[in-house]
């Protein structure tokens, strides 16, 4: 088992709340271990969305490659499945370059999906049923659609915000297709052994200090 672990490819995870200091630490870490970055942020992937996303500035990158930043236009869709695909492509480029990937960000669901290679079973979809759910939401509102999810999968309903209609529909769609709650499916996937030899760092700080840094960052963005 120990020998098998050693043969796995290395992966570093660096996460934590906004303004805790991930960017600065990630750069120093990359210099120390010959690392390259993969952003696990659901908004920094978009171009033209610098304000409010705390996106790293080009001068801060210090010539260290950063993947999944400024690669999509705002009207393009981005979800955990697309993140997983793009992040795996970035991983292969980093490993080929002889470097160590450092996944940085605050979207924990995305990180777990990559770390444990979660299968979201997105291949089959019933367009008719999806359209029916979308029409229901248009007529009755997102809260009513979310209530339908709660009736069949309370755990998913607790985890998914009513306004995240795409994920609500996907959860209902999955239950309709398989008779299994997507929360149960995902939990099973999370119990899989990771294909990576990873270390997982979660940064934290006093709340007041984080809030002060957030205020300072907003002021800088708006100057």
Question: Which positions does each model-derived feature cover?
Answer:
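Phosphate/pyrophosphate-binding catalytic cores of soluble transferases and nucleic-acid-acting enzymes
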Residues: 1-223
């Amino acid at each position: 088992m120990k020998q098998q672990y050693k043969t796995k490819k290395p992966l570093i995870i660096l996460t934590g709340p906004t303004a805790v200091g991930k960017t600065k630490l990630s750069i120093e870490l990359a210099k120390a271990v010959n690392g390259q970055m993969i952003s696990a942020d659901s908004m920094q992937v978009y171009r033209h969305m610098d304000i409010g996303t705390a996106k790293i500035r080009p001068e801060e990158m210090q010539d260290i490659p950063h993947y999944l930043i400024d690669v999509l236009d705002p009207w393009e869709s981005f979800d955990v499945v697309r993140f997983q695909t793009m992040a795996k492509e970035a991983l292969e480029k980093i490993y080929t370059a002889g470097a160590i990937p450092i996944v940085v960000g605050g979207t924990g669901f995305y990180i777990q999906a990559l770390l444990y290679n979660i299968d979201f079973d997105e291949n089959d979809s019933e367009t008719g049923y999806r359209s029916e759910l979308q029409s229901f939401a248009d007529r009755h509102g997102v809260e009513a659609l979310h209530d339908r999810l709660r009736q069949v999968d309370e755990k998913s309903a607790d985890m998914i915000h009513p306004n995240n209609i795409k994920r609500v529909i996907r959860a209902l769609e999955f239950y309709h297709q398989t008779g299994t709650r997507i929360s149960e499916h995902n939990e099973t996937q999370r119990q899989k052994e990771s294909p990576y030899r990873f270390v997982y760092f979660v940064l934290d700080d006093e709340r007041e200090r984080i809030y002060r840094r957030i205020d300072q960052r907003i002021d800088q963005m708006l100057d």
